[in-house]
Amino acid sequence: MTRALPAPAPTAACPCGAGAYGRCCGPFHAGDAVPATAEQLMRSRYSAYVLHDTAYLRRTWHPSTCPTDLERGEADAPATRWLGLDVKRHTQQDPTHATVEFVARYKVGGRAHRLHETSRFVRLDAGGAESPQGRWLYVDGDLT
């Protein structure tokens, strides 16, 4: 499954809550732009979860930690209703490493849940080497 839901209209609110979809996460999902910061990448990945865009999630996941069964995990996604995102902190340790702490609220089967995570990101060039000119990728995260 690449995308189970259609992309929002460009003027519609972005699922990440940071603006209009066409000026926020939409260009990243379409491949027209790349996130300049780890926070932008994290927000675009949250929106991709909302839209069930597994192709984008895979494209922005570090190859050493990306699950091989990502699509299978998305089979339960329609039962998940994402409610909102709150970015608590974005810290850039150096030009190629950053963390983003966030809380994502969602419902499954009518029950409310919170996902509180500190995610780790690395910036890699096309050859897979760490580079300040590379693109940000999600590595992993610690749940709180």
From Swiss-Prot:
Name used for this protein in its record: UPF0225 protein RSc0270
Matches recorded under Gene3D superfamilies: 3.10.450.50
Coiled coil stretches, renumbered: none
NCBIfam families membership: PRK01842.1
Organism annotation: Ralstonia nicotianae (strain ATCC BAA-1114 / GMI1000) (Ralstonia solanacearum)
Listed InterPro entries: NTF2-like_dom_sf, UPF0225, YchJ-like_M
Stated family: Belongs to the UPF0225 family.
